[in-house]
């Protein structure tokens, strides 16, 4: 049995051999079925699936996206089952399948960490999940999670720098930023040494290199400058101020939820786990679970299915 998480940008797979992550942007007509075909060992292979890619703007509404993903997966794995926000498995496209990946993670971890707050910080978003409130989490849509502070649209790679940073201070001068798509989270985190070029798995805004010099040039454009105008230190100031804002936003929300739950226990998964676990004095699930923590929903839905005897 394999676990599959179909996101808007990434396809994550967990099987007996480990974790497999493919950059697979649905808005560019990503070949989900072709990517999955390589993991088929027999026609009767079982697969359990979660998704969040139904929100991609190539679909006119969520049910269109859900149906597309279900059909694409079933072409590779005809017996696939899909986990929903009702904490149940389904064999057909239903509304409950929309953005249920975070709930699978919660369902898997709640027994071992019943009083913890889970932060899953990925390429695009941060899921903030109070495991102590699992019963209240069922049925929550992304809209409701945004309204409750359980979903923050900022991650380690794909977010527009200007979305969090309307202005920066350069040499003591407050400088508005351009809202153009010039630089992303990955550029700031690469410049600050939080990630490596190999971790920069998404496309760059300018479709150019994924290295320090290229990231610094993209960061300079956020203030409508060439790198020569503001220098390396100026670009690093932009990166540092972005990180400060992102850290305040995400860590502040996590601490608020933990306080409401009366707990000091915080566990962290995803590509940003090492960084945010340090900031929050939390437990890095990469150390507890290994590489599967970077594809936690795919791993979790597989474990839930095995634990529940669904197959």
Residue ranges and their predicted role:
Residues 1-8, 12-119, 129-311:
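Nucleotide/phosphate-binding catalytic cleft detector across ATP-hydrolyzing
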Residues 124-128:
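Glycine-rich anion/phosphate-binding loop at the beta-strand->alpha-helix junction
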